């Protein structure tokens, strides 16, 4: 908090998705803060190279998630394994891949722009569904897209095990199931996010780890900083 905010107490209302009461120092976690560029390709000869960039980012994203799975198998945290499987399957989904490639080819845009359009397409489909659980699965598509975008940008994907201090509450705009599953329980006592819901895969992982969590706080990241 800033010095001004520290002088007063304020209450934020969210959705408790995993029970418990904790007190700890804040650790701001921004895993999705990649700098993304959207641009048109000025030469059709660049299209094959752009498609190759996209495919390489898919491969790297798959490799990263498989590594996370292997690390989790060495622990007692098994619930996230099937959820990460879902993300890996999406990375090889032909409709997802072909739609993105089609945008690159037909519109002459870079892979990042094409990927964002693919995400928008899926958002329209999921948001029109009445079932809250199924419509909430758009978050899984978003997590996968963000990982691909970060790999396209060449930026390192920040991981929760980078937390140096102990007894911290992770505060983030959002957390993927993979991010949550990698939290070291001897260092992290709970987490709070701006977005998210009770039926999200991240919430399921938190409950399986018995990690106190509140999501859907809208703007908690505006009020706090690490420490």
Residue locations for each model-derived region?
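Non-catalytic, soluble scaffold/interaction modules
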Residues: 1-227
């Amino acid at each position: 908090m800033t010095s001004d905010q520290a002088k007063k107490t304020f209450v934020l209302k969210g959705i408790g998705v995993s029970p418990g009461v904790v007190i700890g120092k804040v650790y701001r976690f921004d895993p999705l803060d990649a700098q993304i560029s959207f641009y048109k390709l000025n030469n059709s000869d660049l299209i094959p190279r752009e498609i190759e960039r996209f495919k390489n980012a898919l491969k790297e994203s798959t490799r990263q998630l498989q590594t996370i799975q292997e690390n989790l198998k060495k622990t007692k945290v098994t619930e996230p394994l099937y959820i990460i499987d879902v993300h890996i399957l999406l990375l090889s989904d032909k409709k997802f891949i072909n739609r993105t490639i089609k945008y690159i080819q037909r519109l002459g845009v870079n892979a990042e722009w094409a990927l964002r359009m693919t995400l928008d397409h899926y958002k329209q489909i999921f948001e029109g569904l009445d079932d809250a659980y199924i419509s909430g699965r758009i978050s899984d598509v978003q997590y996968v897209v963000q990982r691909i975008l970060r790999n396209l940008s060449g930026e390192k994907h920040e991981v929760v095990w980078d937390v140096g201090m102990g007894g911290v509450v992770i505060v983030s705009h959002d957390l993927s199931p993979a991010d949550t599953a990698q939290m070291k329980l001897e260092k992290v006592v709970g987490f709070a996010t701006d977005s998210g819901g009770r039926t999200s895969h991240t919430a399921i992982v938190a409950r399986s780890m018995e990690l106190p969590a509140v999501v859907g706080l809208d703007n908690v990241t505006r009020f706090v900083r690490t420490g």
